[in-house]
Amino acid sequence: MTDSYGAVSVDVGTIYLGGKEHRVKTASGVVSVIVYGDREKPALITYPDLALNHMSCFQGLFFCPEAASLLLHNFCIYHISPPGHELGAAPICPNDSVPSAENLADQILEVLNFFGLGVVMCMGVTAGAYILTLFAMKHRERVLGLILVSPLCKAPSWSEWFYNKVITNLLYYYGMCGVVKEFLLQRYFSKEVRGNVEIPESDIAQACRRLLDERQGINVLRFLDAIDRRPDISSGLKKLKCRTLIFIGDQSPFYSEAVHMAATLDRGYCALVEVQACGSMVTEEQPHAMLIPMEYFLMGYGLYRPSLFSESPRSPLSPSCISPELLSPESMGLKLKPIKTRISAA
């Protein structure tokens, strides 16, 4: 059914946690948003990495019972998909203009306004982390905090530019072929998860490969083009007074970029958690490693797991509830760095 705001709401009870899909029209195209939970609760916005959506990027985290109890008890979840990355998406018309990273960040504001949201918590992975960070820099008053997984903040390096160019050509001529999926799995996961001649590919990688089969090559190409043209936002990070929790796998190709971002942000507002034996997508590969740092991080907003605090939050969160002590690096989890976790061979 179409409403007066120009969005179509579709019941998708069989899709991820029984959420509801809203298709929100923005200046840069239609955006799919899966909403799950009580909309009177504070909002948690998620944004996935290249070629992924909420099913392939955040399912592991939200299916982790401890993390789910922490996040779903305290937030209403708004899973935003990059244009054309939602489940069952058709190919985007080639004549449609290709959005820039800034256009995608502006879409976030339009989504928030459509749902009538004020300040929100944001969680993004790699390319999605860049989009949400850019949004926070442009609209600081709308962002309560950032939870970033393997984030980007600089313009592409020569090696990343070359890597992206190879994928671009493959997508253009062959679509989501096997070679493209192999490149993407290298982007997402550690060697242990991807497997080799001696170690079989893990269930996580196999599931991701199947979900990548559903992506339209032209749609992935458009998002890749936006990310490949991204500007360096490092200088703006120094002015971003926003509490930020960064996770990075020690086998991620973006490890040095995440460390650079953490070093650039104000130490009083940022904590970096390194996860051992893990690639970029910590949300899928080692979601349990995120639990304790997130608990410490959210305690600064008076949010707890149900076993610790039974009341359900109903009012918008405000940074004013944060005591100065909770803005110290120690209170934000730096004592937990690095997280010593290992993956056992399947």
Swiss-Prot record:
Entries under Pfam families matching the protein: Ndr
Induction: Induced by sucrose and glucose. Down-regulated by auxin.
Keyword vocabulary terms for this entry: Cytoplasm, Growth regulation
Keyword Iron among UniProt keywords: no
Disruption phenotype: Slight reduction in length of primary root.
A single GO cellular-component term on record: cytoplasm
Keyword Glycosyltransferase on entry: no
Places the protein is found: Cytoplasm
Tissue: Expressed in root vasculature, cotyledons, leaves, petals, mature stamens and pollen grains.
UniProt similarity note: Belongs to the NDRG family.
Protein's name according to its UniProt entry: Protein NDL1
Organism this protein belongs to: Arabidopsis thaliana
